[in-house]
């Protein structure tokens, strides 16, 4: 059991090590922090922390550094995360507020998060398990070419140009537009794909061929939207922190290239009392990321969590500030999507 002062000692060790990248000794703790006790007393506290495997001694230093277990206790004991500065909040508001559609806002979000935290930023596209067809539009481009537009309730837009035999007129497109929206509006993507496959059977025989082509194209668009997607930015930030990885940084770079692995990791993370999920060091080993920490938060457009965003970096990171950035960006993104 770690005492209250022991927790305070662990806290300053984490903060000082994150700030300096140098092992922390009892003398520097006494000099820099107002504990009101001797260096010998702090050494005893540090010895107890080491027995609990919360800190460890690098082989060339008399100071101590936090372990994965120490970082975990530090994060779990955070009373609150450090608030963003007014300038940071304004940057989020301005940069994301200029976006024009879902693709643009998510691309801006991942770049902004990488800049705010100096870590690798991750933004998952809205969860397909909760996506539904909002609207389908058919636009005549010429006498034989039609633009099909699929819009989901999560803001994703998929467009295709299709060639139709014959000469489909505006009346035909109006009828098909109405039939399609009545058939699949509000349906989940999987259910919508199944429904579209039978839609051409319900039109007049003379229009069936064109209807079949339109329905088939829309099925392809629905299935394309069922693919999970993840945006990344800031991979160069890992290179600047290469010293924080005891081994080679290559396995980490290889792991973040595997979107399936990252999506599985995000799917297993749950938020704590601060609204942010934190997975540290060895907790990420099954995903090939045992030397990293991952911080994520969910975002939504109408109350339910649609997807997650976050950052990935070395275990030696400023958890409080990065958690605040992740949480603030997720909250602003949710508000932005709800307004659209």
UniProtKB/Swiss-Prot annotation:
Pfam families: HrcA. It comes from the Bacteria. GO terms for biological process: negative regulation of DNA-templated transcription. The keyword Transcription regulation applies. Keywords: Repressor, Stress response, Transcription, Transcription regulation. Transmembrane segments: none annotated. InterPro entries: GAF-like_dom_sf, HrcA, HrcA_C, WH-like_DNA-bd_sf, WH_DNA-bd_sf, WHTH_transcript_rep_HrcA_IDD. One of its GO terms (molecular function) is DNA binding. The keyword Chloroplast does not apply. Negative regulator of class I heat shock genes (grpE-dnaK-dnaJ and groELS operons). Prevents heat-shock induction of these operons. Belongs to the HrcA family. This is Heat-inducible transcription repressor HrcA. It comes from Clavibacter michiganensis subsp. michiganensis (strain NCPPB 382). The lineage of its organism: Bacteria, Bacillati, Actinomycetota, Actinomycetes, Micrococcales. The gene is hrcA.
């Amino acid at each position: 059991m770690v005492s209250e002062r022991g927790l305070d000692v662990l806290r300053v060790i984490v903060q000082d090590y994150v700030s300096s990248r140098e092992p922390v000794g009892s003398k520097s703790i006494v000099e820099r922090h107002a504990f009101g006790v001797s260096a010998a007393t702090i050494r005893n506290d540090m010895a107890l922390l080491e027995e609990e495997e919360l800190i460890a001694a690098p082989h060339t230093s008399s100071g101590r550094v936090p372990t994965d277990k120490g970082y975990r206790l530090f994060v779990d004991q955070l009373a609150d995360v450090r608030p963003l500065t007014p300038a940071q909040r304004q940057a989020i508001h301005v940069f994301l507020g200029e976006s024009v559609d879902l693709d643009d806002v998510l691309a801006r979000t991942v770049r902004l998060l990488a800049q705010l935290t100096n870590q690798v930023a991750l933004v998952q596209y809205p969860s397909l398990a909760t996506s539904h067809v909002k609207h389908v539009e058919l636009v005549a481009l010429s006498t034989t070419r039609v633009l099909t537009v699929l819009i989901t309730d999560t803001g994703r837009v998929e467009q295709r140009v299709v060639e139709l035999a014959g000469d489909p007129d505006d009346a035909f497109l109006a009828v098909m537009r109405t039939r399609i929206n009545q058939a699949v509006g509000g349906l989940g993507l999987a259910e919508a794909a199944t429904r579209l496959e039978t839609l051409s059977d319900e039109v007049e025989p003379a229009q069936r061929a064109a209807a079949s082509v339109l329905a088939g194209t829309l099925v392809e668009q629905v299935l394309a939207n069922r693919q999970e997607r993840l945006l990344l930015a800031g991979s160069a930030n890992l290179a600047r922190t290469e010293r924080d990885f005891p081994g080679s940084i290559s396995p980490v770079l290889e792991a973040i290239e595997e979107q399936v692995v990252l999506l599985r990791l995000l799917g297993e993370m749950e938020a704590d009392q601060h609204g942010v999920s934190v997975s540290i060091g060895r907790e990420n080993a099954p995903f090939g990321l045992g030397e990293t920490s991952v911080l994520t938060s969910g975002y939504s457009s109408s109350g339910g969590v649609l997807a997650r965003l976050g950052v990935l970096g070395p275990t030696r990171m400023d958890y409080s500030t990065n958690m605040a950035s992740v949480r603030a960006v997720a909250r602003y993104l949710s508000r932005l999507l709800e307004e659209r």
